[in-house]
Amino acid sequence: MATAASNHYSLLTSSASIVHAEPPGGMQQGAGGYREAQSLQVQGDYGALQSNGHPLSHAHWITALSHGGSGGGGGGGGGGGGGGGGGGDGSPWSTSPLGQPDIKPSVVVQQGGRGDELHGPGALQQQHQQQQQQQQQQQQQQQQQQQQQQQRPPHLVHHAANNHPGPGAWRSAAAAAHLPPSMGASNGGLLYSQPSFTVNGMLGAGGQPAGLHHHGLRDAHDEPHHADHHPHPHSHPHQQPPPPPPPQGPPGHPGAHHDPHSDEDTPTSDDLEQFAKQFKQRRIKLGFTQADVGLALGTLYGNVFSQTTICRFEALQLSFKNMCKLKPLLNKWLEEADSSSGSPTSIDKIASQGRKRKKRTSIEVSVKGALESHFLKCPKPSAQEITSLADSLQLEKEVVRVWFCNRRQKEKRMTPPGGTLPGAEDVYGGSRDTPPHHGVQTPVQ
């Protein structure tokens, strides 16, 4: 058995380059380095599959074999026949290292020794018994796990592997490679569903390891999983079908939807243009202003419209919707105005009660010169001065007051911030006429 163990070590060294050659005294570093080298080699090479379709290379196969007989082989390294007996019980063709704990070799190194001296045959027997008990427990656990995996559906095995990854997940992947073909077929995606098959430890979307599913396996697993089962704890509720559309019947059916304005009542753009043209002509012929029409509509029908709205309606500047709303009201107003064109009616009374705006006051040239001369003397006269000036010029007091207000505003616009312009007296002489846009106007009452 010692020879077999040494051959086993030579195979590992030649095929996978896992164990480095050490001098005779190199055993003092402990057996943990040997185990760690194996683990690092297997974990690093798991990301690449062989060309023949098998997930394990030759080095991985030999490494998996080393887990089965490493307990006895390590003990028989330098102890002779006693250590060889320990290696015979742990067969190198073990079923699988699934869930196998990290067991260090049973070599006890003395301080300052060569590393091949043991404490005695009693310690070897005790260690051998412990190893046998541990192997029996591992075999029982493996059988239970295999039975549970056979009973589970494939998609549940896939989710269990992704939701509970552990430190020995890469070993479970190696165990899946040793499964017989019948078990691999019954378990579906067990081989490729382990979380250890990742690229340099990268995780897929959602924080779960990205499995290397084949396209056929992925489709076969995803379809029944999404169609029938959803074992995630935060599963989405089943989407309810959309509510049925409201019943639609013929136009006369009570369940049908009726538009307040049917297609027959909705005017076209040509109709609106023709009506606006006729309305404007009739309004001017009857002698009503746009403001009178807006006020009459507010008094008669409760909808107050401004002069601007009526103007925009006649110019076709409103939206189509607003034009359609305003057309029937204006049509009723036209009918009312045409029927009462010969006698004073409520429309005339409403128009007479509308906003009264005083006409523009025109001042004679001589009167304007007198106001200009008084303005140069006193730009802001008092109320008594305005009254006396209005009496002397035979003007209304309000007209004189408004003229002085407009004149002061004109002076502000024409005078720069530095002071008065030179020759202002000549500019504002009596022979000059005030521009028409600065004439006397009375305020709106």
Curated annotation (Swiss-Prot):
Main location, first listed in the record: nucleus
Domain of life according to the entry: Eukaryota
Residue ranges crossing the lipid bilayer per the database entry: none
Compositionally biased residues, Gly residues: 68-90
Domain POU-specific: 264-338
Residue ranges, annotated region (Disordered): 63-173, 203-269, 336-361, 411-445
Phosphoserine modified-residue sites: 343
Compositional bias per record (Pro residues), positions renumbered to this chain: 239-253
Keyword DNA-binding: yes
Composition bias type Low complexity, residue spans: 125-151
Tissue specificity as recorded in UniProt: Expressed specifically at high levels in the brain.
Keywords (A to Z) from UniProt: Activator, Differentiation, DNA-binding, Homeobox, Neurogenesis, Nucleus, Phosphoprotein, Transcription, Transcription regulation
Pfam families noted in UniProt: Homeodomain, Pou
InterPro entries documented for this protein: HD, Homeobox_CS, Homeodomain-like_sf, Lambda_DNA-bd_dom_sf, POU, POU_dom, POU_domain_TF, TF_POU_3
Any single biological process term in GO: nervous system development
Composition bias, Basic residues: 227-237
Cellular localization per UniProt: Nucleus
Basic and acidic residues biased stretches: 217-226
CDD domains cross-referenced by the UniProt entry: homeodomain (cd00086)
Transcription regulation keyword on record: yes
DNA-binding region: 356-415
Entry's Gene Ontology molecular function annotations: DNA binding; DNA-binding transcription activator activity, RNA polymerase II-specific; DNA-binding transcription factor activity; DNA-binding transcription factor activity, RNA polymerase II-specific; HMG box domain binding; identical protein binding; RNA polymerase II cis-regulatory region sequence-specific DNA binding; sequence-specific DNA binding
Entry similarity comment: Belongs to the POU transcription factor family. Class-3 subfamily.
Description of how the protein assembles with itself and partners: Interacts with PQBP1. Interaction with ISL1.
Name of the protein in question: POU domain, class 3, transcription factor 2
Encoding gene (name): Pou3f2
